[in-house]
């Protein structure tokens, strides 16, 4: 689900669809986000597997490693990817960002960070970092309903509803794809 999550985050406000000449940066940022999510899911501690950790890791990877006296300085992200085996999926997902000039890579990382900025808020962090009771597979197989209640006085969090619905919908589509294009039960959104 790393690719689904990355696409949902990049598509905030239109994402790559409304990017025009900047489509490369949004597409590469989506791959970088998916790669980072995958790395944290595989190597991160259980309490580090959340969106704020993704932001922090990308921010840390923006820094340059200390150059070897004879070699050109590399970014930490390049060094990290070199440590992975060639067939590692995180390497493939980040390929567009990794196989480009250093300044372009920095722009891709900045694009990813700008999309993640929406999630840097204490209340948002509490919602996102400490698990959720929503399970797409369970939602598709058992009778269930999800009610989203938003405070009218704080409209700044409304974009989360859109993200939640997009994420759930994409996960449901992935589940349907795994089952020959069909779900066991009918799923409806109102």
Language model: regions and residue ranges:
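P-loop NTPase motor domains
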Residues: 1-190
């Amino acid at each position: 689900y790393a690719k689904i999550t990355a696409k949902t985050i990049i598509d905030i406000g239109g994402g790559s669809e409304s990017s025009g000449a900047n489509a490369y940066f949004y597409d590469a940022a989506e791959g970088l986000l998916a790669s980072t999510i995958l790395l944290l899911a595989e190597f991160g501690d259980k309490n580090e597997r959340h969106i704020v950790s993704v932001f922090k890791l990308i921010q840390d990877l923006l820094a340059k490693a200390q150059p070897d006296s004879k070699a050109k300085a590399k970014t930490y992200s390049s060094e990290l990817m070199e440590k992975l085996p060639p067939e590692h999926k995180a390497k493939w997902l980040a390929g567009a960002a990794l196989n480009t000039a250093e300044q372009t890579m920095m722009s891709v990382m900045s694009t990813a960070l700008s999309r993640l900025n929406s999630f840097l808020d204490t209340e948002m962090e509490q919602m996102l970092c400490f698990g959720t009771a929503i399970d797409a597979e369970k939602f598709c197989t058992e009778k269930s309903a999800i009610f989203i209640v938003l405070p009218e006085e704080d409209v700044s969090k409304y974009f989360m509803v859109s993200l939640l619905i997009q994420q759930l919908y994409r996960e449901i589509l992935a589940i349907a794809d795994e089952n020959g294009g069909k779900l066991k039960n009918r799923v409806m959104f109102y």
